[in-house]
């Protein structure tokens, strides 16, 4: 029995992240080695020629799983029948720009894309927002696509989650696949809280707490947190371009685990619509630890939160509430 292809939308597809992401999707890294895909690529009219170049390369790569490519500058055409939407397109902050100006540009982009998805996407479409400010862009999308269930709209904090795993694995000189259950709480910004209080490392077949193995609270409570929070800026400084390869890879991880499930005993971080869990204000998109099964995520409940964690979780929530207010002020 042939597997029906899934339609995957990538917006901003001619950009850096898009260029890294589309071959990963076409190779089956996002949805699995047996799942055929039809790629829908959207970008703005000035990027139309570059977008066509990406389409040519996708044809040239002869990916067995790639059953078709739609490359367009028309949002309605791009969204038609898509099962998964990865929203990479947005308005980047340029030097000298006020936060409100950037927010205003992104609010109008995400309002328009929300209505295109609302009208044209497949009924159970899963949406992942990557473009910054990711949490608030996802919130705007949710507001203006009321027929898409709120549980189907998420934002990317898996990049931060993976960055945290990477830092622990480097510090302890262990395989990154043996580190699990870090948490990114809050905003995909420098206020995010990378929490290792529940994280473990597998050593000689046994899961041991990261805190115990690292045995350096000063590092875990200080440099580790700031390194993860500021990793994006460090990569821009080194590469003169933003992190594209790691962003694309973590977007694949996010969708892969959401659709195909997380391993037993492992959670991941996803920016999802808050229901008030862990006393986080409802009505914002906030990164929580989640497990996934049968295409649905569930917030991991009942983790003990110490006073220091509480303060950091509240600070990043406050920033998200403030961003929400700013975004809504751009709507009037």
UniProtKB/Swiss-Prot annotation:
Q: A single GO CC term, please?
A: cytoplasm
- Enzyme Commission numbers on file: 1.1.1.37
Keyword presence, NAD: yes
SUPFAM superfamilies, alphabetized: LDH C-terminal domain-like (SSF56327), NAD(P)-binding Rossmann-fold domains (SSF51735)
Q: Which reaction does it catalyse?
A: (S)-malate + NAD(+) = oxaloacetate + NADH + H(+)
Q: Which PANTHER family match?
A: MALATE DEHYDROGENASE
The protein's assembly and partners: Homodimer.
Task: Tell me the protein's name.
Answer: Malate dehydrogenase, cytoplasmic
Gene symbol here is MDH
């Amino acid at each position: 029995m042939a597997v029906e292809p899934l339609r995957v939308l990538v917006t901003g597809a001619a950009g850096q992240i898009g260029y890294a992401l589309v071959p990963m999707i076409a190779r089956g890294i996002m949805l699995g080695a047996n799942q055929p895909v039809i790629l829908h690529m959207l970008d703005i009219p000035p990027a139309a020629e570059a977008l066509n170049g990406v389409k040519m390369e996708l044809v040239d790569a002869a990916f067995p799983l790639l059953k078709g490519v739609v490359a367009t500058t028309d949002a309605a055409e791009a969204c038609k029948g898509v099962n998964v939407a990865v929203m990479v397109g947005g308005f980047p902050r340029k030097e000298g720009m006020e936060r409100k100006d950037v927010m205003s540009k992104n609010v109008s982009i995400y309002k328009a894309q929300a209505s295109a998805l609302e009208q044209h996407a497949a009924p159970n479409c899963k949406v992942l927002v990557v473009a910054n400010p990711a949490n608030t862009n996802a919130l705007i999308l949710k507001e203006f696509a009321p027929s898409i269930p709120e549980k189907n709209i998420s934002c990317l904090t898996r990049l931060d989650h993976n960055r945290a795993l990477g830092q622990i694995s480097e510090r302890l000189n262990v395989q990154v696949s043996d580190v699990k259950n870090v948490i990114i709480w809050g905003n995909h910004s420098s206020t995010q809280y990378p929490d290792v209080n529940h994280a473990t490392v597998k050593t000689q077949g046994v899961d041991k707490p990261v805190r115990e193995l690292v045995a350096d609270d000063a590092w875990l409570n200080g440099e580790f947190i700031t390194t993860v929070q500021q990793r994006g800026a460090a990569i821009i400084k080194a590469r003169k371009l933003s992190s594209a390869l790691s962003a694309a890879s973590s977007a694949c991880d996010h969708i892969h685990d959401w659709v195909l499930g997380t391993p037993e005993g492992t959670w991941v971080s996803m920016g999802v619509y808050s229901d008030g869990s862990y006393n986080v204000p409802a009505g914002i998109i906030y990164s929580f630890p989640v497990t996934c099964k049968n295409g649905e995520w569930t917030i991991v409940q009942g983790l003990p939160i110490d006073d220091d964690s509480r303060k950091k979780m509240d600070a990043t929530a406050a920033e998200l509430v403030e961003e929400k207010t700013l975004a809504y002020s751009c709507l009037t």
